[in-house]
Amino acid sequence: MDRIRKGYESRFRALLQQANARLLEAGVRWLIAKAHCLSERDGISLATALTEIYERLASQPYFRKSNLRSAPTLFFCDAGLGGLSRWLRAAGHDALWRADIDDDDLLREAREKSATILTTDSMLMERRLLRDGVIAALWLPPTLRIRQQLNLVFREFGLKVGEPRCMACGGELVTQDKEAIRERIPPKTYRWLDEYFACSRCGKLFWRGTHWERISKQLHAAAI
């Protein structure tokens, strides 16, 4: 629970910073205390109370105007968010991810590439580079499932579903001549589909079959 509380401290701090609050840390402490009171009064978990307080604050007209962040050109997902990185790519947003990356390398590479970090690690959010806003970052509650993570990222940055990228590496997809790649297409698929794409980075072949239709529906649902 302490990690979740720290994570929400970072979210409250970012929200208040964007609203140019003067007594920043006092404001964060007051919001945490308010969540504790709500938890005790309504008999709900502190995590639920923190979420409710944040959503209430973020939905206020003043904060809605100041809270929307500019859409990043590149995300960098921490080691535990491989699934989220794939879904962001499918939605047309470039997202880096490496399973074996440590925190120091994550910070260094994100700064070099001007990437926005996505993390479930509240302790990482305590790093000075993130606290001071040198590197843009968003903390995601670790209790969220992948679709909920995606929905939160979409809401925080006002993202839209764009042209899909390679879900494996994030490369742009380039239209291919069907006959030129015939040997790479499964025979049954070749007979009923004419449009194919290859990743400009890794060369992986894609087509919009029934699997993609399901993915597309879920992406648009997350964007609502």
Where are these regions (language model features)?
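Long, charged N-terminal interaction/targeting segments
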Residues: 11, 26-31, 51-161
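SAM-dependent methyltransferases
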Residues: 39, 43, 47-69, 214-217, ...
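General structural signal for secondary-structure boundaries
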Residues: 42-45, 102, 177, 186
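Cys/His-clustered metal-coordination modules, chiefly Zn-binding fingers
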Residues: 132-224
